[in-house]
Amino acid sequence: MTTKKLTKLLALYLPYILLGLVATNLGEAWRLAEGKELGEHIMSMMGTFPVAFANPLPSLHPLDLLIGFSCGTGLRLAVYLRSKNAKKYRHGMEYGSARWGNAKDIEPFMAPKFSDNIILTKTERLMMSNRPPDPKNARNKNVLVVGGSGSGKTRFWLKPNLLQCHSSYVVTDPKGSIVVECGNALLKNGYKLKILNTINFSKSMHYNPFAYVHSEKDILKLVTTLMTNTKGEGSGGDPFWEKSERLLLTALIAYLHYEAPAEEQNFATLLEMLNTMQVLEDDEEYQNPVDLLFEELAKKKPNSFAGRQYKLYKLAAGKTAKSILISCGARLAPFDIQELRDLTMYDELQLDTLGDKKTALFLIMSDTDSTFNFLISMVYTQLFNLLCDKADDMYGGKLPVHVRCLIDECANIGQIPNLEKLVATIRSREISACLVLQARSQLKAIYKDNADTIIGNMDSQIFLGGSEPTTLKDLSEMLGKETIDAFNTSDTRGNSPSYGTTFQKMGHELLSRDELAVLDGGKCILQLRGVRPFLSDKYDLTQHPNYKLTSDYDPKNTFDIEKYLNRKEKINPNDEFVVIDADSLPPA
């Protein structure tokens, strides 16, 4: 038994032990008293009390010890029976104990240094460390931000957290305004910036998903992401066609990965292969150029992954195969645009390096046209997988630099496959996901039954204001009820007039749905797992220490994307280069 448990037991039973010891002296007084009748015996005890208590030590006579033991045990039994049968009262909490959190509630979760925190509200923050002084205060860094249009999701939450500059950042940037306004601040804090622009391809770095394919598993993930986010509106029907497309795309991408040179591993080559796959319905023996490629592959590598997948696709009859090709062509139609082909020709983003040193990746997308948003989803899917694998394989399970994904307009980027599993596992790898939505129903529309799992893995949830009924209903229920005092008055008039007042207690929502709908524009509600909710002011961006480095403060700080992308890389004197003399190379 530990010392702590022993001390606790001693404190519990000490009063009864002391009473038992005192009762031994009472037993001695009773034993020394004379008298045959009970009354005479009791009267005689008055004279034996001084004798019995003359010695401060307890009596050790067997009869006295029995009386002492009986008194101590009897009192303990009486207390136990009373507590067991006692009525349970919760004074002031009869109908609910909900209340707003205060400074004392949030204090254990905040780091002393301002820059080592996630900014949640004006007065509440969450430490970045996954190992607080008290382990019970550990929380994951996933955040769910919900707010209607114009509620300040970007200004009051996303920008202040981006300016903290304590992690690498992946920022979904609708309209491309965030990088323009905050890019300069990040550069001055030593960040390397990377930009994928799906609005203006000429102001973007190149991104080639094929560059991150290293195994058959990666091929399947790439195909799944592509298929999931290029379904189109109202897609459904017979799953046969989708499964057939998956077979063909998997076969072609696998062939490019294992057989084609690196410069040909891209969507442009994939489209060229599809365009040469002519099918003649009335000639089953006809072989197109791709058929010949796979026939040659089967001779060299009979059990290749690409060959096995293509063999399954070729089981389709001519007319069916033609329909599959048409479906694949329609799915990859965006890549017929030359600018997009050029964008995905090679890779400059180096997604797997974001956890090595401080880097900010901005994913610029249109908030009105979702045509190219599937590229953003592909980036996130590959990013999560790459960083998790690198953390496990190279860094013992944790990245050197925490990577925070600030996913603004999360509902517009498409579906990230297995997001419900990722948000539950990325915490230990020093990765966090922050989902910014206009309403919770947006998440449910995309992820269906998995939406609740995703929300459940967000330890911090912030409501900035809105009027969507489902969001208001869920939030009001989660805030709970408090117990309030109410009184009724009655005034009876007539021949015998009377007046009365009745006081009673009742339950009332901490904030009802109608009160949430008219929440002050400067207020927000924070819910941190295991802590009372907070009704606080939104964080004022102008008070941030790095605000003066943004273009909001001074237009001179505006970040020029085109100028940054066209700059020449500065050569560091310590950089090492390998010089190859072309004349010394053997002839091809």
Model-derived features: positions:
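Conserved long hydrophobic alpha-helices within structured protein cores
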Residues: F114-L120, F374-Q382, L475
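Low-complexity, polar-biased intrinsically disordered regions enriched in Pro/Ser/Thr/Gly
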Residues: L126-P132, K231-F240, A262, D485-Q504
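Conserved ATP-driven motor cores of ASCE-family P-loop NTPases powering translocation/secretion/packaging/pilus
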Residues: V423-I525
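General secondary-structure edge motif
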Residues: A98-W100, R125, K141-N142, N229, ...
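P-loop NTPase motor domains
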Residues: L18-E28, D134-I431, I446, D514-K538, ...
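Short alpha-helix boundary/capping motifs
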Residues: L75, D356, I454-I455, A486, ...
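Basic- and hydrophobic-enriched, low-structure N-terminal and domain-boundary segments
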Residues: M1-S151, R155-L158, S202, K481, ...
